[in-house]
Amino acid sequence: RDVGTAAMLKLRYPDEETSDYGQAALLPGFVDLHTHLENAVLRGIVHDVPYATWIMTMRELSAKLDVADWYDSAILGGLEALSSGITTVADITASGASCTATQKLGMRSVIYREVGAMDRRRVDFAMHQAENDLMHWREEVDSSRVTIGLSPSAVFACHPEMFRKVAQFAKKENVPVALRLAGDREECDFVRYGSSPFSVHSMDTKRGFVEIPPWLPTGTTPVNYALNWGAFESDNVMMVH
């Protein structure tokens, strides 16, 4: 590595091959700090609707994809990122498709294994599955390029105890954490007031054995809500929205 004018560097390193790119500017690769590569194939299907409607529809459509679909979609998303100059991504995935895809494409990435459960009785089981996946994914990737972490599901799909469990495990195992707390005012209203389409959706989908109503208002902001449950106790926490 060296710095200088083209003429100076050519004199210093006469045996090195040189390339002339004309007026092009050479930049380091861009970094995208929040992706869901496995959902790339769903782009453009749902648009011009409120956030709550959009995200819930996207989750329902994503559930129709199988493992092969998720992998192909993650490859597509990775290729589109590379074509835009993005060489590093921070990706949240439940399937692990982006872990395999970024490894195969030679990208740098931090892959966060999503973990969530609305029912308190399912939290420990969900964490156990996530921990097993995390250890397995670590063995499958080049650790110099790909780092594995954890991400609690969005607040409308996650029991608050999950935040504490993730933070405790992350601190113990020194893994990064990604949080999604307030994607839109509707999500903020869900946390503070117990209202918005998210509360209705939680009852309609009957996730687990959650009592009705499945969510009680907290009277605080999503950030303070997560703070109260210890979500920021680990050493490497990224909040994407």
Please give the residue ranges for each predicted region.
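Histidine-rich, glycine-flanked metal-binding segment
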Residues: 1-27
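Divalent metal-coordination and catalytic microenvironments
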Residues: 23, 34, 85, 102, ...
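Alpha-helical scaffold segments that flank or form the walls of functional sites
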Residues: 25, 43-107, 128-143
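Histidine-centered catalytic micro-motifs
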Residues: 29-40, 176-185
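Structural preference for beta-strand elements that scaffold enzyme active sites
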Residues: 31, 87-88, 108-110, 145-151, ...
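Active-site beta-loop-alpha junctions enriched in small/polar residues
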Residues: 36, 94, 114-118, 151-155, ...
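Active-site gating loops and adjacent loop-to-helix segments of metal-dependent hydrolytic enzymes
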Residues: 41-72, 110-113, 185-234
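Active-site glycine- and acidic-residue-rich loops that bind
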Residues: 151-167
